[in-house]
């Protein structure tokens, strides 16, 4: 039976008070019933990819970048709001040649967080297939983040503990807090990192509070020292990092 004939049959039966569903609607209902959570999570990660691409494609060049690699996907508005906070801080930190600050985002979720995402809160059913697919995408994102770390383009990182430990940042990349501040601040996560939620800047700026409080702030060494321009940029990174950690509410 053709679609045209089927539509006429539906109209006729509907006129007689009999509701006949088009097969395409039945197919979608069946797909949703059996694969609801897979569809939701796939759509979620597609949203993550689209947001990341949009942020990269629409963000103008900045002088220095802060990289977020944590358990949250910022919307476009949230991303811009976070950038404005650090850009304002830059203006208050530098008296001349004020660097424009950009934020690069690599959303990365822990395995426990992924398991929660793929578990139906009503039934407790776990979608193992969708979980494994998302886990693979997560691994790819971590690899991309790792490659970006090696470029030396960024020295200020906001990462979750999984990224911090997976990249061995305290062994290979991070500058000891005592080297920057003269001593390790009380309450620091370890000798290299401070929790974002413990800083005054996080408490003061509501825009930053979309990021998880247990996000770690890490300052890393530059791989490409030598050229005067690189050294100048690194010193700007260092000054901004200190301003973030030592921020005092007005």
For each feature predicted by the language model, list its residue ranges:
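Extracytoplasmic "Venus flytrap"/periplasmic binding protein-like
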Residues: 118-197
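Bilobed periplasmic-binding protein/Venus flytrap-like ligand-binding cleft at the lobe interface
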Residues: 199-250
């Amino acid at each position: 039976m053709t679609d045209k004939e089927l539509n006429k049959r539906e109209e006729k039966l509907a006129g007689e008070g009999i509701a006949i569903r088009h097969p395409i609607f039945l197919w979608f209902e069946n797909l949703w019933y059996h694969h609801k959570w897979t569809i939701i999570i796939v759509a979620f990660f597609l949203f993550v990819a689209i947001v990341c691409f949009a942020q990269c494609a629409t963000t103008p060049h900045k002088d220095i970048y802060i990289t977020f690699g944590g358990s949250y996907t910022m919307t476009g508005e949230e991303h811009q709001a976070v950038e404005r906070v650090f850009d304002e801080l830059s203006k208050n930190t530098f008296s001349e040649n004020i660097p424009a600050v950009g934020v690069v985002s690599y959303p990365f979720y822990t395995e426990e967080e992924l398991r929660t995402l793929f578990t139906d809160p009503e039934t407790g059913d776990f979608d193992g297939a969708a979980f494994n697919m998302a886990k693979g995408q997560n691994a790819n994102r971590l690899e991309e983040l790792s490659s970006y770390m090696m470029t030396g383009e960024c020295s200020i990182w906001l990462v979750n503990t999984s990224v911090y430990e997976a990249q061995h940042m305290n062994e290979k990349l991070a500058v000891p807090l005592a080297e920057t501040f003269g001593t390790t601040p009380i309450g620091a996560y370890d000798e290299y990192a401070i929790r974002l939620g413990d800083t005054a800047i996080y408490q003061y700026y509501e825009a930053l509070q979309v990021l998880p409080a247990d996000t770690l702030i890490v300052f890393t060494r530059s791989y490409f020292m030598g050229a005067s321009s690189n050294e100048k940029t690194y010193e700007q990174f260092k000054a901004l990092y200190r301003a973030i950690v030592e921020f005092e509410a007005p």
